Swiss-Prot record:
Biological function: Involved in the gluconeogenesis. Catalyzes stereospecifically the conversion of dihydroxyacetone phosphate (DHAP) to D-glyceraldehyde-3-phosphate (G3P).
Record's subunit section: Homotetramer; dimer of dimers.
Protein name as annotated: Triosephosphate isomerase
Any GO CC annotation of this UniProt entry: cytoplasm
GO molecular function: triose-phosphate isomerase activity
Organism: Methanosarcina mazei (strain ATCC BAA-159 / DSM 3647 / Goe1 / Go1 / JCM 11833 / OCM 88)
Length: 222
């Protein structure tokens, strides 16, 4: 297994807003350089350019719409976030759910603009369906565990291992991330042992009093 991929989602936490978005990204970059582990961040949309301009690491959008240029007031246009410095995007996070048609349209737009795409799912069947669309990653996150502090890798390990198995049968090129309740080194280790290639996490790092120390704890068993 290669080095895991870690994506830190800032959500709309005040600690990850504005200057805080840059400060946390700098902590991620430092830990990434020291460990050799790829760590990316997903700040709020208005902070994408700020973070991408000030810190050399992969920046993801928390959402994008499957639309093109034109009369789409309030939508998130893939070309715009790409030119702001985004490297990729989340699609269908449980806090920003989409219909199947919208997921497919967003993924198509992400590919059109050269953005790495992560489709979020909540169980094995939806993970299998997402894998059939061929994103770069699927991220399995049971919504009831998000922000709970209870890692999915312990609360429901079968949903992780089952997702990994389902994806490998449909398209082994699609990588699987594990999310929900991930915050400590044991959580990441368990997620990797279940076959995932990395994790999607948020509050355990963003809201920590010392995000750098929290990241160092997260990767200590890798």
């Amino acid at each position: 297994m290669g080095s895991p991929f870690i994506l830190l989602n800032y959500k709309t936490y005040i600690q990850g807003t504005g200057k805080g978005a840059v400060d946390i990204a700098k902590a991620c970059k430092t830990v990434s350089e020291e460990s050799g582990i790829e760590i990316a961040v997903a700040p709020q949309l208005p902070d994408i350019y700020r973070v991408a301009s000030e810190v050399e690491l992969s920046v993801f959008s928390q959402h994008m719409d499957g639309i093109g240029a034109g009369s789409f007031t309030g939508h998130v246009f893939g070309k715009c976030i790409k030119e702001a410095g985004a490297f990729g995007t989340l699609i269908n996070h449980s806090e920003r759910r989409l219909t199947l048609a919208e997921i497919e349209a967003s993924l198509k737009a992400a590919k059109e603009f050269g953005l790495r795409a992560i489709i979020c799912t909540n169980n094995v069947p939806t993970t299998a369906a997402a894998a059939a669309l061929v994103p770069d990653y699927v991220a399995i996150e049971p919504p009831e565990l998000i922000g709970s502090g209870i890692p999915v890798s312990k609360a429901d390990p079968e949903v992780v291992s089952g997702s990994v198995e389902a994806v490998s049968k449909i398209n082994p090129d699609v990588k699987v991330l594990c999310g929900a309740g991930i915050s400590k080194g044991e959580d990441l280790r368990a997620a990797l042992d279940l076959g995932s290639q990395g994790v999607l996490l948020a509050s355990g790092i963003v809201k920590a009093s010392d995000p750098k120390a929290a990241l160092e704890d997260l990767i200590r068993l890798v």
